[in-house]
């Protein structure tokens, strides 16, 4: 995570020596084993170009970092593993990125795909946000309704169970109100907004309570009754039903790999970006795969 200039300063050597040592560094891929639980994701190496990363879910070791995320690049890498080794993989966690689905099943026939729960909720939240924007634009910009919804839009997006019950003076309404009372007023301005809000909250509730039957039952019952933006999301969810049910029934997610991606961003930021992908890859493996030995403190005897 430290820049090469800082490493050189700490070791009292030249920066060119640090760079030379980095160039000499080699990581050998072990193609004889794969973890039972693996996480897939992508990150931005350069502007406009996404790269692929796979991580061991349990010990957090990086399995591979590939320069691109195309199916050909990923397939060519994992086909270097024997089929028997690939069949040892039982779980793959990933974001909602459909090109990965068929590829994962081809390469790892025994693996279940688990979609990241955060991204499923994020899709619902974005659909609600876009519907809200379309509804608010039906009001005059100078109207009270437009100003109120625009001012308190976060209450519509928020989990209704987390609304504060503290009462404050609200200049927009010229009275003291709780967040729940404000929300009731906002929903009274549009039946369409109220319908989509209650549906959104119910879906979030069933999802967080890990009730797949109720979650998908609600989607199927309302598929033809909702805004096209919600219809698109609902159709995607129904297509990925098995993977979403896995996400609700199994205790795995992409959260650990997202944290790793934040460390990768830190490495990249400290270096002011990398022009050479191999050097970037080496820095990632050094920072994340080499475990530091803990210093054992010895108490001096008097």
Where are these regions (language model features)?
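Short alpha-helix plus adjacent loop in nuclease-associated cores
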Residues: 120-141
